[in-house]
Amino acid sequence: MNIHEYQAKRLLHEYGAPIANGVAVYSVEQAEKWAKKLPGPLYVVKSQIHAGGRGKGKFKELDPDAKGGVRLAKSVEEVVANVKEMLGKTLVTKQTGPEGKQVNRLYIEDGADIERELYLSLLVDRNVGRVAFVVSTEGGMDIETVAEETPEKILTLPINSTQGVTSSDCARLCDALDLHDSAREDGEKLFPILYKAFCEKDMSLLEINPLIVMTNGHLRVLDAKVSFDNNALFRHPDILELRDTSEEDPKEIEASKHDLAYVALEGTIGCMVNGAGLAMATMDIIKLYGAEPANFLDVGGGASKEKVTAAFKIITADPNVKGILVNIFGGIMRCDVIAEGVVAAVREVGLKVPLVVRLEGTNVEQGKAIISDSGLNVIPADDLDDAAQKIVAAVKGA
């Protein structure tokens, strides 16, 4: 689960991280009221959407030469003028896709005199099974670009979970970021704070880009992106309250209601599979035969007929889907239950695209018989390779 920048900053500030004074606003009236209470004289007006690249983004409704989704203002009047121009508009960035995202809230904060921009993030390093810091002196840039062009400017530092962030870790991070004097002292305080927040709140990503050194020598969190492990949200009702469903794919929201693991992709072949590993393999073989999956969808090990029907509705809600592949290995999951769900779903949604079903495992013969006796136009497959070839051929022939 993602949250907005202003929410991430509030959370980090609760742990003691240095942030600027700021306020989230939903209207022009709020913007004028609260901007007057900020110290000024420099303000930053920032679009709040779940996507990066906001500063270089463009609003669909405005002139192509208009400013982007992050703007400087030198007076309250300029703040208000920018809010009027930005609020309710559709911001297109490199991460939103061409459809963009509507800006329903803005964050107004004090400006800062910047001396240097740095990059800092925490993530789970699966290679070593630890939370790791990733830092670079090249802040304000796309870290993937830095990794590709100048990897020597990036330090990845895994943290020993039994010791936490040690003084030695702090020294290495400060050296990598070239921090001195007050900035170094701030860094030695900040790194343990961020690690504590990451672990206690079950984050999957904490990214600060940039972390700035101001002209007064101190550090400040200028931008923050935080993602949480969805599987741990039951432990954090306070975090769950920060969820903004308007920023999420409606299909993914509907899937979560039925305990389905769903991720929308950009292809044309819808997939319904049980088990994450099998789902990944299914997507891989679809690509192998020259097509693209439209989604990742894992129905889990104990899906009911109702759950399967819900999965079909979610897949067919995507207008890009030109065919569907159901690939089930019945271990805990019974193939006859899947078959009943498939038949019920096809009848309920009035399926108009090709459907290939591959079943194997528990009660497979009963499952195949249910589909065969249904009289529906379902293409059976003997194995995964056969299923992938059939659905790709059916879609290309459609």
Swiss-Prot record:
Transmembrane segments: none
Any Pfam family hit: Ligase_CoA
Record-annotated ATP-grasp domain positions: 9-254
Domain of life: Bacteria
GO BP terms, alphabetized: succinyl-CoA metabolic process; tricarboxylic acid cycle
Cofactor annotation comment: Binds 1 Mg(2+) ion per subunit.
Listed GO MF terms: ATP binding; magnesium ion binding; succinate-CoA ligase (ADP-forming) activity; succinate-CoA ligase (GDP-forming) activity
Residues reported to bind Mg(2+): 209, 223
E.C. number: 6.2.1.5
Names of required cofactors: Mg(2+)
Positions contributing to substrate binding: 274, 331-333
Gene Ontology terms: cellular component: cytosol; succinate-CoA ligase complex
Disulfide bonds: none
Sorted UniProt keywords: ATP-binding, Ligase, Magnesium, Metal-binding, Nucleotide-binding, Tricarboxylic acid cycle
Residues holding ATP: 46, 53-55, 109, 112, 117
Pathway given in the UniProt record: Carbohydrate metabolism; tricarboxylic acid cycle; succinate from succinyl-CoA (ligase route): step 1/1
UniProt-listed InterPro entries: ATP-grasp (IPR011761), ATP-grasp_succ-CoA_synth-type (IPR013650), ATP_grasp_subdomain_1 (IPR013815), Succ-CoA_synthase_bsu_CS (IPR017866), SUCC_ACL_C (IPR005811), Succ_CoA_ligase-like_bsu (IPR005809), Succinyl-CoA_synth-like (IPR016102)
Known catalytic reactions: succinate + ATP + CoA = succinyl-CoA + ADP + phosphate; GTP + succinate + CoA = succinyl-CoA + GDP + phosphate
Family under the similarity heading: Belongs to the succinate/malate CoA ligase beta subunit family.
Function according to Swiss-Prot or TrEMBL: Succinyl-CoA synthetase functions in the citric acid cycle (TCA), coupling the hydrolysis of succinyl-CoA to the synthesis of either ATP or GTP and thus represents the only step of substrate-level phosphorylation in the TCA. The beta subunit provides nucleotide specificity of the enzyme and binds the substrate succinate, while the binding sites for coenzyme A and phosphate are found in the alpha subunit.
The protein's assembly and partners: Heterotetramer of two alpha and two beta subunits.
Identification of the protein by name: Succinate--CoA ligase [ADP-forming] subunit beta
Gene name as annotated: sucC
